[in-house]
């Protein structure tokens, strides 16, 4: 007689039916807006103990897959050395709030809202706030708020060459309001080369994520409503795990860095 295999027919580490039901429920509720990381965070809140990759593998085995979209090939981005300490360099940029998010008086009176964003290059920890006018004065207001919000000293600030940040390309003599404040604080202001937004890649990427996870889903009647919703979104994004941070959130990495 031929000896039969003694190997188990089922993987002992395979997800249980109960775990699979939880994955399916979380996927249906959170994937479309928040992606795999949103699904994983929800499962962890419900006591799920397995790894992120294990969850994705199980979900795909169950037939839960993302919709594939054709992506145009991208040039290989230049890699820059990762910074080691919070505050070594903070990127700042402005995003115009999409017009199709406006409702009520904001839409009726043709208002425009603008989101200022600061992101710490080391930890990806962010601060955001919206204003109604795209002006240098609002950049200074944002900076003053930022200095109170970030729990570490900012050593350098990097921006593009927009007039809300610098007058370098429009005046040989006049200094922008932001530069006046930064000079008084002895914080260097780094300007990226003209027409090279990839040099501010981290804040640009964060704006794309804001579009995907926030603006594609929300509407606003007033500036106050926008800032209230932005506050909740900011808390979520600062606590969202990131593969680039070793499956940690900006809040987790920041706490580790400050405790070291």
Predicted regions and their residues:
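Mobile genetic element proteins and their domesticated derivatives, centered on retroelements
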Residues: 23-26, 39, 55, 93, ...
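An active-site-proximal beta-strand-loop segment
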Residues: 92-127, 137
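Short, well-ordered secondary-structure micro-motifs
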Residues: 102, 167-170
């Amino acid at each position: 007689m031929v000896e039969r295999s003694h190997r188990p027919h089922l993987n002992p580490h395979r997800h249980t039916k109960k775990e699979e039901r939880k994955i399916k429920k979380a996927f249906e509720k959170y994937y479309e807006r928040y992606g795999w990381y949103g699904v994983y965070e929800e499962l962890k809140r419900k006591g799920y103990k397995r790894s992120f990759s294990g969850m994705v593998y199980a979900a795909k085995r169950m037939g839960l897959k993302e919709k594939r979209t054709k992506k145009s090939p991208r040039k290989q981005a230049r890699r820059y050395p990762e910074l080691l300490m919070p505050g070594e360099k903070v990127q700042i940029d402005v995003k115009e709030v999409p017009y199709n998010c406006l409702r009520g008086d904001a839409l009726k009176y043709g208002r425009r809202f603008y989101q200022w964003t600061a992101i710490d290059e080391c930890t990806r920890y962010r601060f955001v706030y919206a204003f109604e006018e795209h002006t240098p004065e609002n950049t200074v207001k944002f900076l003053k708020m930022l200095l109170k919000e970030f729990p570490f000293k900012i050593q350098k600030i990097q921006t593009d060459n927009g007039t809300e940040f610098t007058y370098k390309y429009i005046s040989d003599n006049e200094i922008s309001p932001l530069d006046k404040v930064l000079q008084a604080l002895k914080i260097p202001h780094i300007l990226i080369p003209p027409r090279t937004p990839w040099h501010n890649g981290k804040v640009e990427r964060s704006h794309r994520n804001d579009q995907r996870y926030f603006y594609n889903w929300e509407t606003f009647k007033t500036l106050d409503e926008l800032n209230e919703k932005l506050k909740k979104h900011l808390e979520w994004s600062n606590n969202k795990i990131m593969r680039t941070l070793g499956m940690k959130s900006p809040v987790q990495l920041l706490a580790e860095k400050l405790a070291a």
